[in-house]
Amino acid sequence: MATSAGKLRTLYSAHSSLSSLPPSARPTLQLATLRSYATTTPHDSPIGNTSNTPPTVKRPATAFKDKLNAGPAFSDFVSGKKDEPLDPAEAYALKTALVGPPGRKKEITRLPPWLKTAIPDSSNYKRIKNDLRGLNLHTVCEEARCPNIADCWGGSSKSAATATIMLMGDTCTRGCRFCSVKTSNKPPPLDPHEPDNTAEALSRWGLGYVVLTSVDRDDLADGGARHFAETVMKIKQKAPNILVECLTGDYAGDLDMVALVANSGLDVFAHNVETVEALTPFVRDRRASFQQSLRVLKAAKAAKPELITKTSLMLGLGETEAQLWDALRALRAINVDVVTFGQYMRPTKRHMAVHEYVRPDVFDLWKERALEMGFLYCASGPLVRSSYKAGEAFIENVLKKRRGENAGSVNEKVTTSENVKKLVAGEAMM
């Protein structure tokens, strides 16, 4: 206590002596005086004397700081302008670039410029997002962190706006090593209002093309096929002119359920093989297989021959050229009409690492090869996803042309529709 009082008296006397100094000299000395007492440690040096102050020791860089410096910057994900194309040397340098803190395992963390996208910003995008929240609907666009959400939801001069609705909740019973959707053995029960809510939302948006997909529901006896078919029928009732693509699971190999969905009134039946056969056990859930996916696509075409069938493959997982050729031949052998190629992008550190960032010219090459093999249409590029710009003008025109040619077979369509309704209701087909 005495020590504190002594310090205060010293400070007061020092302040009094300052008043006799010229104004220009006061601030520096006052600051030094106050600093000498603004500490809880003893300070035995004279007032204003800082010559004995120990030098500041610089803290070593932390592991966290190293990780931040090695990781991708914000500009690696978003770009407001179109990048100039890279020459082959620059592309190879990016492909082989390894970064990371010294003394640790290095990996590719910076994205090539062809994987940059614009920030979503359009009135259509905002309207769709608000309606989704209000009707408690999910989209694979958001759940799977798709980079094309701005293009699809906003539309373009070449194609109508599209959206991919994810049915049956946001929790999957499978755990594929490339997918960021939540997984659980016991997901929540189905929402009985979802078919009506989905149809209501789509009738508001004025979309030209919609993709319906779903999580896998191995906990349900029918895998959710009846729920899927009911949703398609509700949409067609409220918006008969909208084109509907269904990207389905494999229904645990139950081909009767595949036929049920194929006859529900959809325009495109899609089921993804995801990767080549050799990599399937390492990429997809153990309950899925390349051959089972082929059987699903074949059954859909058999149930409704005029139906467009579609599948998708990811590149950059370590597949070889020979394996890709084999996959395309197998798909053409069962008359798959449309195939898409896209770059695999690792959603989180818990998922499979990217083996390679495939150059855009390689995607162009595989598009040419697919079309030469007889595929009706092929979308191929680093940012292409299975439902990316599904409303492409070419597919829309093909579907509308087929719709006009088939307009005369009304009785056949009515009979099929009635049979599907009975199956959805749990009745036996007559």
Swiss-Prot record:
Residues 1-37 form a transit peptide. It comes from the Eukaryota. Binds 2 [4Fe-4S] clusters per subunit. One cluster is coordinated with 3 cysteines and an exchangeable S-adenosyl-L-methionine. It is found in: Mitochondrion. [4Fe-4S] cluster 2 binds at C172, C176, C179. Transmembrane segments: none annotated. It catalyses: [[Fe-S] cluster scaffold protein carrying a second [4Fe-4S](2+) cluster] + N(6)-octanoyl-L-lysyl-[protein] + 2 oxidized [2Fe-2S]-[ferredoxin] + 2 S-adenosyl-L-methionine + 4 H(+) = [[Fe-S] cluster scaffold protein] + N(6)-[(R)-dihydrolipoyl]-L-lysyl-[protein] + 4 Fe(3+) + 2 hydrogen sulfide + 2 5'-deoxyadenosine + 2 L-methionine + 2 reduced [2Fe-2S]-[ferredoxin]. Residues 155-376 form the Radical SAM core domain. Residues 39-55 have a biased composition (Polar residues). PANTHER family: LIPOYL SYNTHASE, LIPOYL SYNTHASE, MITOCHONDRIAL. Belongs to the radical SAM superfamily. Lipoyl synthase family. HAMAP family: Lipoyl_synth (MF_00206). This is Lipoyl synthase, mitochondrial. It comes from Ajellomyces capsulatus (strain G186AR / H82 / ATCC MYA-2454 / RMSCC 2432) (Darling's disease fungus).
